[in-house]
Amino acid sequence: MNHYLNAFLRSIIEAVTEFLPVSSTGHLFLFSSFFPFSGESLEFDDLFDIFIQSGAILSVLFLYREKFGSQMLSSFQYLTKRNSDSQGFYFLVQIVIGAFPILVVGFIAKKFLDTIKARPDLLDILASAWIFGGVLILIAEWFFQKRQGTEEKKTVGFRDAILIGIFQCVALIPGVSRSAATIVTARFLGKDTKSSAEFSFFLAVPVLLAAGIYKLIKHRSILNEVTIPILAFGFLISFLLCTLVIRLFLRYLQKHSFGVFGIYRILLGVGVLVFTKFIR
């Protein structure tokens, strides 16, 4: 397959799955298992995934530029005693608190996680994680149907940020999905669908940014006149499509729950298990 066509298809997969609770990493691995970049190393695959994830980060910063800008300005004014309003400062602190656990655990458990990703039965692990996550999403939606009439909370507090950040660590297991872990936790804490999704978006920024910087430094030796245009192409496509997907996702959540993503995960997981056990 042509490198640019491969990059285009991977960018579409990243854009559609990064902020949905379905595991973008799992989908990208599934695709690359059948359609790898011909002639390129695994390091290039890894770096390309980081570039398209960076495009996803930029889409969040672009869509929420006014919110991030005002919160950062408010934080600066609060810290320099020019403003007594602490809301912006505490918002940024919550993002840091929520991102901190997965950054620490990811660093400590890096070798173990790399071992999991190198296992020959990784597709089975992904399938199991898809099914398990799908069941959890359906349980969460059932839980909220039982709570009909109870007011859902739109504000994420410090306790919420800590708990969401802790459970986000589960997403280090391939196939679990960072979005699923954060959204499901937020829902069990009583947050409405939009607030759950948006806080998940915000948490993605420091987490994916840290991973991106680390891997860019690690794989900088493969940057050259051949690879850079492909990486830049994937970054641009991911940014443009992710911007559209986030808008459509939030519009969808105005009238629907996360249940359909739970069903999708279960069906995908079962399909992959059937393939690995009976077809491959």
Curated annotation (Swiss-Prot):
Source organism superkingdom: Bacteria
Protein name: Undecaprenyl-diphosphatase
Record lineage: Bacteria, Pseudomonadati, Spirochaetota, Spirochaetia, Leptospirales
Protein's UniProt keywords contain Cell membrane: yes
TM region(s), chain numbering: 19-39, 44-64, 89-109, 125-145, 156-176, 197-217, 226-246, 259-279
Family: Belongs to the UppP family.
Organism of origin: Leptospira borgpetersenii serovar Hardjo-bovis (strain JB197)
Catalytic reactions on record: di-trans,octa-cis-undecaprenyl diphosphate + H2O = di-trans,octa-cis-undecaprenyl phosphate + phosphate + H(+)
Cellular component annotations (GO), alphabetically ordered: plasma membrane
GO molecular function, one term: undecaprenyl-diphosphatase activity
GO BP terms in the entry: cell wall organization; peptidoglycan biosynthetic process; regulation of cell shape; response to antibiotic
Keyword Cell membrane attributed: yes
Bilayer disposition of the protein: Multi-pass membrane protein
